Each structure stands twice: as structure tokens, then as C-alpha cells.
Amino acid sequence: MSRRPKIEEAMKRVESRYELVHAAVRRTLQLLREGEDFFVQEGGEVHKKTFAAIEDIAEGKVKIIKKKEESGSKEE
């Protein structure tokens, strides 16, 4: 049986769902640059790298860095 990513836990580390999506996309791209496979095997289960990205955020394995608002620029 496949388990779901820890979205509720990941939401505790960000201010909004938008920020979680943005961070997960950036982490997924980072994972893809590190390896060729889109899937990762974890404990006998196969998951997409997007799953691994959300897990990394939920477990605090990655640090989410926010750009500070500068005059005339948008905050990310």
C-alpha cells in the first residue's frame, strides 16, 4: 500500500499553500538535476521526486529561503 506525502507537516514549515507548491517545485528540480531518474525508491516503494520533495520539506531537510522585499520589487 502506498503512503501519501506529509503535506500537513510540510504546511507547518511554510506560510501558505502557494509557498509550499513553489518550494516543492524548486526542490523537485534540484533533485532532478542531481540524478537522472524521475522516480525514487524508498523502503521498497517507488515514488515520484515530487513526493520526495514534499517529504524533505516536511522533515526539515531543506531550508526555505525567502527573498526580502526590496523597494519596488515583488516578494517571492
From Swiss-Prot:
Q: Kindly state one GO CC term assigned in the UniProt record.
A: cytosolic DNA-directed RNA polymerase complex
EC id: 2.7.7.6
User: What is this enzyme's catalytic activity, as reactions?
Assistant: RNA(n) + a ribonucleoside 5'-triphosphate = RNA(n+1) + diphosphate
Signal peptide bounds = none
User: Which Pfam family, any one, appears in the UniProt record?
Assistant: RNA_pol_Rpb6
Question: Can you name one GO molecular function term for this protein?
Answer: bacterial-type RNA polymerase core enzyme binding
A GO BP entry is: DNA-templated transcription initiation
**Record keywords:** DNA-directed RNA polymerase, Nucleotidyltransferase, Transcription, Transferase
Top-tier EC class: transferase
Q: Got any disulfides in this one, which pairs?
A: none
**Which InterPro entries does the entry link to?**
DNA-dir_RNA_pol_omega, Pol_omega/Rpo6/RPB6, RPB6/omega-like_sf
Q: Would you say which domain of life the source belongs to?
A: Bacteria
How does the annotation summarize its subunit structure?
The RNAP catalytic core consists of 2 alpha, 1 beta, 1 beta' and 1 omega subunit. When a sigma factor is associated with the core the holoenzyme is formed, which can initiate transcription.
Give the protein family. Answer: Belongs to the RNA polymerase subunit omega family.
Give the function comment from the record. Answer: Promotes RNA polymerase assembly. Latches the N- and C-terminal regions of the beta' subunit thereby facilitating its interaction with the beta and alpha subunits.
This chain's protein is named: DNA-directed RNA polymerase subunit omega
Annotated organism of origin: Aquifex aeolicus (strain VF5)
As recorded in Swiss-Prot or TrEMBL, the protein's gene is named rpoZ
